[in-house]
Amino acid sequence: MCALRYLRPDLLHLKPYDAVPPQAADKLDANEFPWDWPVGFKQKLSLLWEKGIPSNRYPDAHHQGLKQAIAAYAGADPAQISLGNGSDELIRSLLIATCVGERGSVLVAEPTFSMYAILAQSLGIPVVRVPRHPETFALDLGRCQQAVAEQRVRVVCLVDPNSPTGNGLSTAEWEWVEGLPAEILVILDEAYFEFSQHTALPKLAEHPNWVILRTFSKAFRLAAHRVGYAIGHPQLIQVLDSIRLPYNLSAISQWAVQIALEHAEEFLADLPLIRQERDALYQALQELPGVRVWPSQANFLYFRVAGWDPQDLQRAWQELGTCVRCTGGGLRLTVGTPEENQRALERLRQILR
């Protein structure tokens, strides 16, 4: 029994999100972009910090300029945009807006991004976990539909392409999503949109119960600044802006996003190389004994190795200098620089030899 009797008992067993220390050698565990900002842009941001951002003043609380810039980039209206301190804050706000107060449960298809379940549990919201197909990682539509019918599902969480498995939603899965009742919020997490180039945005106007989440942490190389955004119905956006914490984005993070969007073409110019490296890694992993690797539409690959416990393999790899994420009964390998990718393969060959 916990000595602190004011704590909720269910939180005592909740595990925090696990992350590898930043000083790790080759960090291929967090789906970060492998290259930092170009020096010229970092200098521009540094000059803004030095000359244009008063440290004694709070940042822009309403993000109006940033909303306009994001709307222009995404092809949406500023009234459809809400910003969060990472997509995690937006997920939490969406769950508060829909499920808190015993209004319903959250449906997740696992393996998937773990923060949906973690945040729901932290808010005391029931989580309905439906396993994906063990070979294809497709949704089990029969069990999903049964959960919707029987478990008071208020929110369906879908990552497209899914993390950690890298697969996008199929035609049948989209048909199921489009048939969900209007009282269920569908969160469509497009964190890897820039890599997959697939978006639900063209159909958003037909489905006011859909909301898209995106991030600047991946393709725009802004993981250190923690900025995510939602695209949704203006009334939903108004609620999100009302319940989020005040001044949730630092001034320097807001300016970093502005700079990234002003130079989006330059920042996204390396995406073809990432896709090329991903495909080369996929082919190389396929050739290794006992390795089962799945195709990916994102900047990572998911695989399993026959005869190996994923955690043991993760530890062995990390001891040699490559960090990967162990999740969902397998390993997720982020696409790094060509040099990091080559070292990762050489070390894996050494382990499996």
UniProtKB/Swiss-Prot annotation:
It catalyses: L-histidinol phosphate + 2-oxoglutarate = 3-(imidazol-4-yl)-2-oxopropyl phosphate + L-glutamate. Pfam families: Aminotran_1_2. The modification N6-(pyridoxal phosphate)lysine is found at residue 218. One of its GO terms (biological process) is L-histidine biosynthetic process. Pathway: Amino-acid biosynthesis; L-histidine biosynthesis; L-histidine from 5-phospho-alpha-D-ribose 1-diphosphate: step 7/9. InterPro entries: Aminotransferase_I/II_large (IPR004839), HisP_aminotrans (IPR005861), HistidinolP_aminotransfase (IPR050106), PyrdxlP-dep_Trfase (IPR015424), PyrdxlP-dep_Trfase_major (IPR015421), PyrdxlP-dep_Trfase_small (IPR015422). Its EC number is 2.6.1.9. It is an enzyme of class 2 (transferase). Keywords: Amino-acid biosynthesis, Aminotransferase, Histidine biosynthesis, Pyridoxal phosphate, Transferase. Signal peptide: none annotated. Its cofactor is pyridoxal 5'-phosphate. GO terms for molecular function: histidinol-phosphate transaminase activity; pyridoxal phosphate binding. Belongs to the class-II pyridoxal-phosphate-dependent aminotransferase family. Histidinol-phosphate aminotransferase subfamily. Homodimer. PANTHER family: HISTIDINOL-PHOSPHATE AMINOTRANSFERASE, HISTIDINOL-PHOSPHATE AMINOTRANSFERASE 2. This is Histidinol-phosphate aminotransferase. It comes from Synechococcus sp. (strain JA-3-3Ab). The gene is hisC.
